[in-house]
């Protein structure tokens, strides 16, 4: 397999991945355009594109309500944005391939671990902020000593593993999907005989990858809402 890398630019001694930045911006732009288009001329009785938008929003709302309860309305928009970003980002790499012998210019943003860990850290940051807002900084920090002070290392480790598992699960599934797609594209140009087989396999794999992309976005908001719910429901569960 040919080795290609994403073009980068250095700023203040930090290398920025131009492909990932561009694809992330494209993902955000697609979300904005779709939501803007679907929400134009909204009616009391939804139909067509408005119906699809409301269905997705209700799907997210119903999913996170299991973990957030009466706090659902406070986080429904955040979870809708997270779901939309992860789902579209997961599937961008399936649309086409754009590369030279040296550089790759098209990929799924979530096939990059930096994007996934950033999303996970964002969720963790919100969890801690909401925990402090709910219990106060003293009460929140005291929670790390529950049920006994001896549990402090385990409670801290749990916070780290939550972030790592959220990022690694997403990265592993999407990155491996792009690797298989790349192998099928190479199989297509290997010989005239493997072309039709690769084409058929690629159609099946693309459909399967889109399904996996949806499942990963769905799991991402389930886990994110679960982590946030644990922080805001802490006192109520005790």
UniProtKB/Swiss-Prot annotation:
One GO location term (cellular component): plasma membrane
Any one of the GO BP annotations: proton motive force-driven plasma membrane ATP synthesis
Key words, A-Z: ATP synthesis, Cell membrane, CF(0), Hydrogen ion transport, Ion transport, Membrane, Transmembrane, Transmembrane helix, Transport
Identification of the protein by name: ATP synthase subunit a
Assembly and oligomerization: F-type ATPases have 2 components, CF(1) - the catalytic core - and CF(0) - the membrane proton channel. CF(1) has five subunits: alpha(3), beta(3), gamma(1), delta(1), epsilon(1). CF(0) has three main subunits: a(1), b(2) and c(9-12). The alpha and beta chains form an alternating ring which encloses part of the gamma chain. CF(1) is attached to CF(0) by a central stalk formed by the gamma and epsilon chains, while a peripheral stalk is formed by the delta and b chains.
Species per Swiss-Prot/TrEMBL record: Streptococcus agalactiae serotype V (strain ATCC BAA-611 / 2603 V/R)
Upper classification of the organism: Bacteria, Bacillati, Bacillota, Bacilli, Lactobacillales
Residues making up the signal peptide according to the UniProt record: none
Family: Belongs to the ATPase A chain family.
Domain of life: Bacteria
Entries under CDD domains matching the protein: ATP-synt_Fo_a_6 (cd00310)
Pfam families, alphabetized: ATP-synt_A
PROSITE patterns, sorted: ATPASE_A
Entry GO MF terms: proton-transporting ATP synthase activity, rotational mechanism
Subcellular location as annotated: Cell membrane
Keyword Magnesium (UniProt): no
TM stretches of this protein: 18-38, 75-95, 112-132, 179-199, 203-223
Membrane topology summary: Multi-pass membrane protein
């Amino acid at each position: 397999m040919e080795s290609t890398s994403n073009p980068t630019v250095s700023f203040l001694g930090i290398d920025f991945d131009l492909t990932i930045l561009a694809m992330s911006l494209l993902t955000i732009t697609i979300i904005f355009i779709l939501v803007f288009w679907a929400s134009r001329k909204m009616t009391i009785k939804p139909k067509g594109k408005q119906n699809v938008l409301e269905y997705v929003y209700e799907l997210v709302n119903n999913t996170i309500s299991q973990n957030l309860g009466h706090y659902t309305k406070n986080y429904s928009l955040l979870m809708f944005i997270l779901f939309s970003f992860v789902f579209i980002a997961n599937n961008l790499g399936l649309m086409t391939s754009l590369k030279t012998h040296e550089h790759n210019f098209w990929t799924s943003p979530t096939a990059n671990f930096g994007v996934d860990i950033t999303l996970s850290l964002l969720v963790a940051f919100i969890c801690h902020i909401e925990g402090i807002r709910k219990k106060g900084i003293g009460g929140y920090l005291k929670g790390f000593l529950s049920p006994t002070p001896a549990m402090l290392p385990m409670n801290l480790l749990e916070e780290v593993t939550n972030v790592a598992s959220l990022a690694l699960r997403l990265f592993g599934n999407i990155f491996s999907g792009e690797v298989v797609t790349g192998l099928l594209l190479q199989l297509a140009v290997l010989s005239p005989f493997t072309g039709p087989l690769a084409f058929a396999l690629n159609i099946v794999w693309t459909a399967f990858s889109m399904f996996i992309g949806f499942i990963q976005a769905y799991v991402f908001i389930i886990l994110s809402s679960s982590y946030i719910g644990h922080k805001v429901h802490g006192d109520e569960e005790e």
